[in-house]
Design a protein with these regions (language model features):
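Transmembrane helix-loop junctions in multipass membrane proteins, especially transporters and channels
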Residues: 5, 48-50, 82-90, 146-149, ...
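Functionally critical transmembrane alpha-helices in membrane proteins and complexes, commonly lining
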Residues: 1-47, 67-70, 105-109, 180
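Juxtamembrane loop-helix boundary motifs flanking transmembrane segments in multi-pass membrane proteins
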Residues: 11, 15-18, 51-55, 59, ...
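Hydrophobic alpha-helical segments of integral membrane proteins
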Residues: 34-36, 42-43, 47, 72-77, ...
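Conserved beta-strand->loop/alpha-helix structural units within folded catalytic cores of enzymes
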Residues: 33-38, 66-71, 129-142
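Transmembrane alpha-helical segments and their boundary/interface "anchor" motifs
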Residues: 28-31, 46-83, 93-104, 133, ...
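Aromatic-enriched alpha-helical transmembrane segments of multi-pass intramembrane proteins
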Residues: 97-194
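Residue-level signal for alpha-helical transmembrane segments in multi-pass membrane proteins
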Residues: 3, 41-44, 76-84, 140, ...
């Protein structure tokens, strides 16, 4: 059929498709795995520690791990987009590459619903949402330490209820994605407790 031919044509147009086929076809599965593994790792590092981690230290640790790579890739992608625009009069892949969207990326808020469309290093939207989930995690550490898996089950059921209640239909994409990311993150913590 025409649609299957069109799909094959689109696949072959992707850069290095023959070598990167697996990542093109199944790469989307990495995002849920990323959130779930992050939840597990955070539980391992921060829960039931004898020494409490201060909020300041927690967020300094997060910033130190995330920001250097984020900033480096943002600069590289920006330079590549400028080069592309100079030689082809067009940006590549993501087209909202202006100063406004640069600052959204710079401050890790490009996935929070302020954007007009995809821009610069768009896959970083996952990390911009994870920053919110990190804050939620830090706030819930005392409850996780006190109630353990019971707290996760209640939190997860509340998030699931929000999903199934229809409330989410009124939400923006960011709120819906944030709910999904939180469920995946806390699923990783659930696995930690098992």
């Amino acid at each position: 059929t025409f649609s299957s031919i069109q799909i094959d044509i689109n696949k072959t147009m992707k850069p290095f498709y023959s070598v990167l086929e697996y990542f093109y076809d199944y790469g989307y599965m990495g995002v849920p795995m990323f959130f779930t593994i992050s939840g597990y790792v955070f539980a391992y590092v921060y829960l039931n520690k004898k020494e409490k981690t201060s909020g300041r230290q927690f967020f300094i640790n997060r910033f130190a791990r995330l920001y250097p790579l984020h900033f480096t890739t943002l600069i590289i992608v920006t330079l590549l987009q400028i080069t592309s625009y100079k030689f082809t009069d067009s940006f590549q892949i993501y087209f909202f590459n202006d100063i406004y969207h640069f600052f959204l990326h710079l401050f890790f808020i490009n996935g929070w619903g302020f954007q007009d469309g995809t821009s610069f290093n768009q896959p970083i939207w996952t990390v911009s949402l994870e920053v919110i989930v990190y804050a939620l995690f830090f706030i819930t550490i005392p409850y996780l330490n006190k109630f353990g898996i019971k707290f996760i089950i209640i939190l997860y059921l509340a998030l699931l209820l929000i999903d199934k209640s229809g409330i989410q239909r009124e939400w923006t994409d960011i709120e819906s994605l944030l709910n999904s990311c939180a469920k995946l993150f806390y699923s990783g913590i659930f696995v930690f407790y098992l």
